[in-house]
Amino acid sequence: MFKLAIILALLFFGARAGAVRDGYPILSDGCKYTCKPLGENQNCSRICKEKAGSWYGYCYMWACYCTDVSKKAVLFGDSGTPECHVWIK
């Protein structure tokens, strides 16, 4: 039973370490890239590719959201990023 618990813990922590990172890329002021229309969006796909090293992006809640971003990408909410103080851009 103890061995099973160790194996499950290793699998869990291993999966977290290699977890795919998704999120909102940000402008230099810490704000998200706004978009419309919602859903498939060529502008968001371009932003995600250029700013986050992502292969796919779409417009979600009026902001560009990127999937499977590079480890170097800076995303909204990352520590050390500026806080956005603008409600509408």
Curated annotation (Swiss-Prot):
UniProt note on tissues of expression: Expressed by the venom gland.
Gene3D superfamilies on file: Knottin, scorpion toxin-like
GO cellular component: extracellular region
Cleavable signal peptide: 1-17
Annotated InterPro entries: LCN-type_CS_alpha_beta_dom, Scorpion_toxin-like, Scorpion_toxin-like_sf, Scorpion_toxinL, Scorpion_toxinL/defensin
Name of the molecule in the record: Putative sodium channel toxin Ts30
Compartments reported by the entry: Secreted
Cysteine disulfide partners in this protein: 31-84, 35-59, 44-64, 48-66
Domain remark text: Has the structural arrangement of an alpha-helix connected to antiparallel beta-sheets by disulfide bonds (CS-alpha/beta).
Keywords on record: Disulfide bond, Ion channel impairing toxin, Neurotoxin, Secreted, Signal, Toxin, Voltage-gated sodium channel impairing toxin
GO MF terms, alphabetically ordered: sodium channel inhibitor activity; toxin activity
Taxonomic lineage of the native organism: Eukaryota, Metazoa, Ecdysozoa, Arthropoda, Chelicerata
Pfam families: Toxin_3
Coiled coil: none
Record-annotated LCN-type CS-alpha/beta domain positions: 21-85
Any one of the GO BP annotations: defense response
